[in-house]
Amino acid sequence: MIITSSAFGAELVVMSSVGARSVMDELGPQFERASGVVLSFRYDTAAALQRAMEDGARFDVAVLTSPVMSVLTAANKIAGADQSTFASALIAVAVKHGAAKPDISTREMFVQTLLSADKISYAKEGASGQHFQRVLKQLNLDEALRDKLLPMTGAKEIEAVADGLATLGVQLTSEILPVKGVDLVGPFPGDLQNRTELKIAVSTESKSTDLARRFIAYATSSAAAEVIRAKGMIPP
C-alpha cells in the first residue's frame, strides 16, 4: 500500500460492533502503518451504535450486524453500494479458567448445563444475547432460568465469568477468546446456533470516501482473513 500526501495524517472514524474488536485491534494498526491514515475506533453493541448513528454521530466506516446495517442503509446512513461482508461468528459458552468444561454438544446436554449453572451472564443488547433469549423461549427455559440470568451491558458479560459472578457466559466466540480468566467451552449445538454476520460499509456522510473504501478493501483482503480466523471469526 502506497502512502500518499493526501492520506498521511488523515483520520477515519470507525464505529464497530464489539464482536469485531479483537480483529480491528490488529488490523487497525497494520492499516495505519501502511497507509498513514489515523483510525479512531468507537466500539459498542450494534444496537447502541445504531442509535448513535440515527442521532447524528459522525463516522466514516461502520462494522455492524447485517440486520442493523440493513436498517441504517434504508435510513440513508450507510451507502448501499459500499458494503462488504466482513466476517461472521458463532455464539458460544465460556467458563472460568480452569473450571470443568461441560458437554454442550447436543441439545439435551446444553439444556442440562444451563439448568445446572448458578448464574448465566449474557449481553442484554448484543446480537448474541438477543439470540440467547430466543433460545431460552424455544426450549421453554425462560421461566425456569429467570433467577439465574445476568443480563449485562458494556461488554462485561464474559468478565463476569472471570470475576466469578457467573458460572457460564454467553457471547460470540470472538468476544470470549480475548478475555483473560475464562475458557471457551464451545458453540451452541445444532439448530440452537445462530451465525452472526458482520458487514463493513461507508457512511453516506463521510468526507473521506476514498480512504474509507481503502480501509474496507484492506479489512476484507486475504491477509485480513488470516487475522479474522485467528481471532475466532469466520471470513467471508
Set out the residue ranges of the language-model regions.
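Bacterial N-terminal signal peptides
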Residues: 1-5
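Exported/periplasmic ABC-transporter solute-binding proteins
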Residues: 8-55, 63-75, 80-89, 95-236
